[in-house]
């Protein structure tokens, strides 16, 4: 009996233990499930936090990159301006040599305008008073039909003796130089556009380079002609615009006359002043005309370093040749000039 009782008691204990273990296992499983769920939620929150942090970091990096790009551009602009100033300073070193040659610093300025730019014309002309080297004359060529529209501010400049207004045939941009060539051929002529402010030493540097290269056209800005492997002139759109990798004098540099260009006497072929030929082959593409007529004369072109920055007068860019389809006209007239005169590099 004692053995049977002991056996029954042991059986009850085992059942109780088993029941307790099952209950414990269920409790453990429940706790593990909760921990797993909690860890999953924490993982999701961590991923969301990391994603948000990544976006914020990306935004900060983008802003930093943008700021750096701005800083780099500012530094680049400062270095470019410094390089221009250095080039101009270097040219002044030639002054003692030139002065020793008893130079004649006389020259004339030629400029044209049209009614859309008349309001700013007096500003452009008055600004020339700051030039270190002053011209013998500033000739302003205006189409006969436009004279009546000239504002009083321009007429007052003529009354003061500072400029001389000349009426001429309406040749578009060709008025910049064609009438001046017919007017005199003894002094260098500097051409400028009517919509720009210029560095106050532009005329001085043009004349310095004129004495260093007396037979060359001196231009503050140039385009470089491009040719194919066979030597044919490529379309104007493929030329190297605002070329600054060399100075010349060279056959393949075309002066852009509005930024400040000095034409020595006899630098252009006699046909340059022929209004009929200009109108036929190069109307409103005057720079191409001067270039071809220079090359026909055997004249080379030199780029003036350090003075190629364009500083436009406010409100002058609303109307201009480039806004009126002059891009296409360059292509058309280049083909006409090549057909008429041939490759200018080969002259």
Set out the residue ranges of the language-model regions.
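Short, acidic, metal-binding catalytic loop of nucleotide-sugar glycosyltransferases
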Residues: 126-135
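Short beta-strand-to-loop acidic/aromatic patch adjacent to the donor-nucleotide binding site
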Residues: 187-195
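N-proximal low-complexity "stem/linker" segments adjacent to membrane-targeting elements
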Residues: 60-127
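Single-pass membrane-anchoring alpha-helices
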Residues: 29-58
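Conserved catalytic core of nucleotide-sugar-dependent glycosyltransferases
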Residues: 199, 204-275
